[in-house]
Amino acid sequence: MQRDFAFIQTGPDRVFVGWGPFEQAPMRRPGRPAFFIADFFLDDPHPWRHPSSWEELSFAALAARFQPGESAQVTWTPPSIDEFAPLFESAIAAMHRGEFRKIVPVLFESGTGRIDWRVLLERLPSLPPHMWAYGYSYQSHGLIGATPELLFRSQGRGYATMALAGTRPIARAAELLSDADRKSVV
């Protein structure tokens, strides 16, 4: 049985890793690292995962924590362009009406089966230099990905972050407190 974990890249060949078991909570607890692991629709009432231990290390050191597994065998369910196209067209029309200034189209592709985390983690250093990796494995499901937006950066004994899509100026922060706004912004 593989131990639950979550990671986020913090620099070239540096990754912050949280190891399970994770404590689930509705809010992040001050003074402790936490990972926001929620479903896409933000329906989980306890999306924050506080690891029992954490560390920062290289991708190679992280990959070495995993035993070589069996060959990955995943059955993929491809995204449906027939479902996506009308939603995308609707979003473009809303932008033209001035309802949105930016949209982030999303397609879902999911797979079932087994993966070899060691192999995936060993491949992460070969990502293009402008891509930043993140992922988790938690209670028999997981995700691994990369984004062109730097999520966190090691800075001395701490971490720095940047504003991401969906953020608001501080003067408009109260708008994010309503559930409807939170779902439309996040």
Predicted regions mapped to residue ranges:
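Secondary-structure transition/turn motif
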Residues: 11-12, 50-54, 147-149, 163-167
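Cytosolic ligand/metal-binding cores
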Residues: 19, 30-32, 153-186
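SIR2/sirtuin-family catalytic core signature
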Residues: 113-155
